[in-house]
Amino acid sequence: MSLQNAEANLKEFGKELNLEGLAFDENHTCILGIDNTFSLHLTYEPNSDRLYLYSPILDGLPKDDPSKLKLYEALLEGSMLGGQMAGGGVGVAVKEELILMHCVLEMGSGADPSSLRRFAPLFVESVEKWRERAKNIIEGRDPGATGIPGGGPIGGGGQPRPPGKDDDNPKPGDRFIKI
């Protein structure tokens, strides 16, 4: 039943892309080229009833340790609880010099046949932002590992506030609604 859900999701996604006949191969994988810049891999895993989406963020790791550290910090910060990664995460294959961003869609009984169609644009947009961010870090054009695609200091300034000017700073709990 779950493979049928994954196939229905892929078919619905194919209709959205005007790619009728989109199907999984014998390994339950479908690979799509995105704007001739990167690939979107869709793999159904029958043992877990999950559809995995994954794409390369970077192919080739920085050679110098400071750039590598800055890149890893940005990726780790951005992937905390999936916050900047469409709810997913990131992994590094050091020997292969590859960084992949990934997400999972449940395909068990009752899975919505349009969940992939609705989710894929968000995932692709996030991959594009992280690819740009990684490129900027490697090229030395990223001012800080903030976890925000595009970099830059949080708040946009980066200048320390003069003493006594902390009134605009939120206090712990200010951004939360008490229920």
Region spans (language model):
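Hydrophobic residues embedded in beta-strands of well-ordered beta-sheets
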Residues: 30, 49-51, 97-99
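Well-ordered alpha/beta subsegment
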Residues: 87-121, 135-142
